[in-house]
Amino acid sequence: MPRSLKKGPFIESKLEKRIAALNSKDEKKVVKTWSRSSMIAPEFVGHTIAVHNGKSHIPVYVSENMVGHKLGEFAPTRTYRGHAGGKSEKGGSAPRKK
């Protein structure tokens, strides 16, 4: 469920201050954050933000079409390793019962 428009977007204040400081100095450093729920604002465009996925920080380069989304959408937390299955040389599975 999206956030109410009268409340406005949630952006962690510390993250917002860091990006504002980088914008005033015209610097492009990687900013680490654990705030996956922060909304991407137009001021973030062009910066690389390292978003924590529970194990490590994933660098996310912010482009214009990411504005309005949350940072956590671009740092997946789960790794898919495939379904378990029998590895036979023929490539087939066990014969089915009728």
From Swiss-Prot:
Keywords: Ribonucleoprotein, Ribosomal protein, RNA-binding, rRNA-binding. One of its GO terms (biological process) is ribosomal small subunit assembly. Gene3D superfamilies: 30s Ribosomal Protein S19, Chain A. Residues 77-98 are annotated as: Disordered. GO terms for molecular function: rRNA binding; structural constituent of ribosome. Coiled coil: none annotated. The keyword Ribosomal protein applies. The keyword Ribonucleoprotein applies. Pfam families: Ribosomal_S19 (PF00203). One of its GO terms (cellular component) is cytoplasm. It comes from the Bacteria. InterPro entries: Ribosomal_uS19, Ribosomal_uS19_bac-type, Ribosomal_uS19_CS, Ribosomal_uS19_SF. HAMAP family: Ribosomal_uS19. Protein S19 forms a complex with S13 that binds strongly to the 16S ribosomal RNA. Belongs to the universal ribosomal protein uS19 family. This is Small ribosomal subunit protein uS19.
